[in-house]
Amino acid sequence: MKKPIHLTVLLAALLLAVFATSFVQADTLVVLNKSEATASLIDLESGRVRATLPTDFGPHEAAMSPDGRFALVGNYGSREKPGSSLTLINILAAKVVKTIDLGEYQRPHGLLFLPDGRRALVTAEENRTLLVVDVEKAAVVNAFVTAQDVSHMVEVALGGRRAFVANIGSGSVSVIDLEKGIIVRTIETGAGAEGITASVDGKEIWVTNRSADTVSVIDAESLAILAQISCASFPIRAKATPDGKHVLVSCARSADIAVLDAATRKEVRRIPQDLRAVDTGDRLFGDQFGESSVPIGIVIHPDGKKAWVAHTNADVVVEIDLETWKIVRLLEAGREPDGMAYSALEVKKD
């Protein structure tokens, strides 16, 4: 004889199902459109833009909170007028929930959430400074003056103890001890130090020196330069793959992606993008690279199977299969896409 199923058991199962579906893992890609002052929220299952949200002018970079619920956007501004704000986006609700005024700090660019999910690091180029921002309080709680020109991108290593800031104008990396609150060292890496990524184990920092056509590998603890890797054609961003085997580098001039072997520290392949600029007028890089589609921002899926690259002069995001090293899809973006961030959550707005 079958035992009757208790009503409380049925209710518990129903509540569990409702809770589970309220945070469907459907993958959302946030793409910032610099010339439109918008953020596109793309559903990665369908490839469809689920929402287009306003930011302040010149959104350049985005960072995702550790739980995937919020994207933080740095509003860089225009050539004529520097920006001084951050935009906070709720991914599930697909809406802007807060604008953070940075006051005297101008041209916010590189940014990332710290592990606590409450604070974020933000570079302020105009002030040659790295900021610590309390996102909940919408306030700057600390500032580290790099004294370097064009402090552009930021990365952390050693469990979040140290921050590394790439300074384009000075060709250097500033190292900041976040626990002690001090600048530890300034490391000269090469002309145009810009893109920066940490190895998966957090022991190395990889820096693209765009004007020198090199990539520097720095020991995050000793701060010694371990290698200088040749990487031609204006290497502008870098991103380490989750398996720790490779580092992807977007090369703006040649409009392709260099794949570096993390162990041998050598370039092992190029992934052609087969795209051209749709136009070059009124864009950050203009016609500096001719008909290049100018690939910049790179995001890699946590499972390491896919990567997305924003082509800022072609108004498109390319999806790459990292097992075959081939392009598998093009995603529509707004005008001049660049910074991106990934969330495992699904936008709920229709």
Regions found by a protein language model. Give the residues of each.
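Positively charged n-region of N-terminal signal peptides that target proteins for export
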Residues: 1-4
